[in-house]
Amino acid sequence: MDRVLHFVLALAVVAILALLVSSDRKKIRIRYVIQLLVIEVLLAWFFLNSDVGLGFVKGFSEMFEKLLGFANEGTNFVFGSMNDQGLAFFFLKVLCPIVFISALIGILQHIRVLPVIIRAIGFLLSKVNGMGKLESFNAVSSLILGQSENFIAYKDILGKISRNRMYTMAATAMSTVSMSIVGAYMTMLEPKYVVAALVLNMFSTFIVLSLINPYRVDASEENIQMSNLHEGQSFFEMLGEYILAGFKVAIIVAAMLIGFIALIAALNALFATVTGWFGYSISFQGILGYIFYPIAWVMGVPSSEALQVGSIMATKLVSNEFVAMMDLQKIASTLSPRAEGIISVFLVSFANFSSIGIIAGAVKGLNEEQGNVVSRFGLKLVYGSTLVSVLSASIAALVL
């Protein structure tokens, strides 16, 4: 009963926070919101509680385990005994496999398997979310291709997309993650929470956006043609491009981690020193924990653990999900399984401030005017995407 009450409270909080920034409350279609919510709760139960769902998750994680094993073969060849001895563990074991996974995605894209999957799942989503096919295709392609390369598939129509639809596309990209780094997440979190979050975020995105950014799509706007990302390229040209793109992602993540972890350590020391003058000695992350404490509690985290979880939530928002996942690993043994599951689901998304620049830059490279539009609603993007993570984690809490 306590879980149900927490869930109802979480729904109310998410709804109120979404309605506060809604562009047009009169256009909200409650039927689709309820429809999506029911489907999402059922999917959460399926993936986190049912034998069939857990079996699927196990099979999915075992597949990624094998892929990571293949990736290690390449890493071992280049770095040799460093990998076997556990040296530079995070870069070699977590980030380097991104190169191999990226290459696989490129192959599946080149042989036209991924476009078929994107269109099939997108078509089904469009039947239940009350939005257009473009939004539904974009949700699936964002999950597979990532928040920056995803927009290349729509480069020919970006200039024709309305402001409302542009917000939906950008928010969807920020609320999901790229399949190329799912393997990296699975080395840091329990695989079942990663898989559940991938599915839940897709539905939570449409629920939150139905409240924040409601609109109707005209029939004339539905003639969408996705571009072939690598038209005219040979197989090996494409493969080389995806391998280099994967390595670039690994290097960027490594650089971001170095910078953010160092910055947070400096801020922790500064805040501890300043607050120490008043006899408290509270770190920067400790202060953020107090700010996010009520949100963590509303999501269903036990009050005794909400401060720790709130601190990790805030760390993810101001830095990125990798920094937050590393912090979670340090305290995971002190958390209850319920709290660990809730925060794990929350962390699996790109909802943070640095993503504003990534998405705006990607769009601006294809269409400068639309890139400026995305930049202008950057803070609203992070706000909406964070609500998506809160909703997904709250739904997971209901069935954990």
Curated annotation (Swiss-Prot):
The keyword Lyase does not apply. Residues 25-36, 108-168, 214-250, 303-341, 400 are periplasmic. Binding of nucleosides to NupC requires the presence of hydroxyl groups at the C-3' position of ribose. This is Nucleoside permease NupC. Nucleoside transport protein that can transport adenosine, uridine, thymidine, cytidine and deoxycytidine. Shows weak activity with inosine and xanthosine. Transport is driven by a proton motive force. Does not transport guanosine, deoxyguanosine, hypoxanthine or uracil. Also shows activity with the chemotherapeutic drugs 3'-azido-3'-deoxythymidine (AZT), 2',3'- dideoxycytidine (ddC) and 2'-deoxy-2',2'-difluorocytidine (gemcitabine). It comes from Escherichia coli (strain K12). It is found in: Cell inner membrane. Keywords: Cell inner membrane, Cell membrane, Membrane, Symport, Transmembrane, Transmembrane helix, Transport. Residues 1-3, 58-86, 190-192, 272-281, 363-378 are cytoplasmic. It comes from the Bacteria.
